[in-house]
Each structure stands twice: as C-alpha cells, then as structure tokens.
Amino acid sequence: TSILSSMDAASREEFDFLSNITMQWNLLMDFVCYIERHNIDSAERFIASIETIDRVDFMYGIFSGLLPRQTVKEALEGNLEALDTDSPIFRHYVSVERARWLIEHEKDVRTRISTFLKVYWEQVFSRLWQDIGVRELDCLADERRLLGQIGAESYIRNCHPQIVIEQGAIRFEKQVELSYRRTDIENVVVIISAFIAPDLMVNCVEGCLTIYKGISLPLRSSVEVSEEI
C-alpha cells in the first residue's frame, strides 16, 4: 500500500493542493536548496523555521533566486507590476500568474506547507529516515574517496550524464537547458540522495551551485520506499 493511499482524505487533499501550487513540489525543493546552503541539521527545526523565516527570503528561495531580491520585496509590498513578464523565469520556469498568486498568498502558503510537512515528518518520513539516512551516511566515505581519486571536475561531471563541463561554463541538458558561467560559481555543493535518480536536480543561488547526486543504497534491511515520496 502506498504512503499516499494510506493518508486520510483531508491529508491527501492538502498534499494534492500543495503539490499543485508548488509545481509537484519543485518550488519547495528550490527553497530547500537555498536554505540548505547553511546546512539543515534538524528536520524538525527546519520545518518550524518555515513559518518564521523572513518572507522575502522565503519567496526568493521559492523562486530559486531567479528573481532579484528587490523585485520580490516590492511584489510582496503590493507592487505586483514589479514582476517583469519578459523575465526568462516566467517563460521557462513558472508562470507569472502562478508567481503572483504565490506572492499574494505567501503567508497562507507558508503555514500550510509547514503544517503538512510537520505531520508528514512525524507520521511517515522520520521512520524511513532512521534507516535510509544512516545508509546515505555510509555512502559518504565512498563518495569522498571517489572525489579524491578523480578530482573535483571529473566528480561533478560523473554526478549525472546530463552534466556537461565546458571551458567557460557548466551546462545541464535538462528539458529546459541550464548553463552557468564558471566565473558566476563561487562554490559547488553535491548532496547525495536516494530519492533523485534517474532525474537531474540542480540549483544555483548567489554563486552556490547545488547538485543532487542520485545513489543506490547498500542493502542492509528491507525498506520499501514508495515512488510517491
């Protein structure tokens, strides 16, 4: 039985609502990428912080740093015309209508995300993490050893077949191709995850490029993980 099918009707309805407004959770993952630059050492504290974080920071992270912080601030203060409809973010990433709706309902969205994630963590994911998290940590030694053997550039390239490193840029051959100039990247963070493969997930905010590397966990015990997680 999948995790979602075991939810009560109200929880499933809330999951579907939040999934829809965050583009199947992609916008929330961008926010997590933004916050994770400062390390998330406690899921409980991170979830609780969603409701108290500065609202400009919240929306800036939701939009993956693709909208200038000043633009986000002006829009939150009521000037929705500050959102430039010709911006690439609205052509390739999120519609301007969705962006305006999220900004207008920012407080309610934050509260509902925080409330749902708290329930999800306590009732579902914390139990899985007790096993999966430990096994992900076990993989770190192998990843560090590989990094030392082949060097940073080759390691990054080998995180996913859609990553292309060129002389002046790093390119990601996704449905909407992404490319970042090397001079715009101050540091690279690679996060290993058992939930990403085979997809490529990347984010670059304020010079910090985050790449999620999908890994296969060593078999230690039988834990079934639903694709819907």
Name what the model sees in each region:
Residues 227-229:
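Helix-turn-helix DNA-binding segment
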Residues 70-208:
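DNA-contacting interfaces and partner/effector-binding or oligomerization modules
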Residues 217-218:
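Long, highly charged low-complexity segments enriched in Glu/Asp and Lys/Arg with interspersed Ser/Thr
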Residues 1-116:
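N-terminal low-complexity or simple alpha-helical regulatory segments
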